[in-house]
Curated annotation (Swiss-Prot):
Pfam families in alphabetical order: DUF4589
Function: May be a component of the protein machinery at the inhibitory synapses, probably acting as a scaffold.
Composition-biased stretches (Acidic residues): 189-209
Localisation per UniProt entry: Postsynaptic density
Sequence similarity: Belongs to the INSYN1 family.
Compositional bias per record (Polar residues), positions renumbered to this chain: 259-274
Keywords: Coiled coil, Synapse
Disordered: annotated span: 1-22, 113-174, 189-287
Keyword Coiled coil in record: yes
Keyword Coiled coil included in the entry's annotation: yes
PANTHER family: INHIBITORY SYNAPTIC FACTOR 1, PTHR15917
Ranges of biased composition (kind: Low complexity): 153-167
Protein's UniProt name: Inhibitory synaptic factor 1
Amino acid sequence: MSQSRAPAREPSETPSQREQIRSHMKMVIQQLEGILKELKDVAHELREVVGQIDKLTSDLELDLDADDWTVATASSTSSSERGLCEAFRLDFLGQDSLSDSWDFCSFLESSSRRSARDDTKPPPTTASVYSQMNGGLPVPNGPLIITPDSSSEEASSSTHSQSQKTSRTAGTRERVRFSDKILYHALCCDDDEDEDEDEDGRDEEEDKLDTDSERSPLAGSPVPPLPELYNCREPPAGGSHTIPRKDALNPGCRKKLLRNSSTQTVSDKSTQTLLPYVPAKHRNKDL
């Protein structure tokens, strides 16, 4: 029992230790009292300095408005009776500061609305861009999703039909797509050496047809004969009175037709008429 109660017993403090603690507390209290006295002396000196400043600045006349006061002016004009809190107090709830903050908030809201409108606008499509480039008018030959081959006959036929369907307004120019063959024959000269050799035999047949047409009773009509168009078609199998097929054309005559179509102007192709090609030899004979 004595061994279990032994650790519970605490050694009683000696009177010497208590006296040491009391002496330490008295020393701390004395130091705090000395600090308070020093602070009072500093405050008294500051008041004296402020009084001297007021005496020196009493001759100066400073007309300051309440709106122009700042922290520096408030501290310089403060007297000894005013405390530090009154000198450095800022009026954050004034009317001017509230109005400025309200204007700034409204500016932020307007800018956010403008940015939201810009984000909601869809990007311009290619059709609208091409219409703006043409002065707001629709472009007949604009970007197409599916375009035929440039060397095929579908390209030339489709572009020609589109140019006839669309009405051309004044002051606009249409873009016409030429096939590779038309461009080649448009850049080359009309009378090629290779074609002249092939056309020698055909010229004789055309002369015979011209003489036959002169003997006919319709020779005096104003419509000129078109032997070359009939000669371009293949000879019919059923006879001379059968109607020739539309697609039965010789390759040489097809080149002539393409070459004649290339002589039309690019600006207004829809108003031009298709004229037959007459070689230079026949022109000299007619003259």
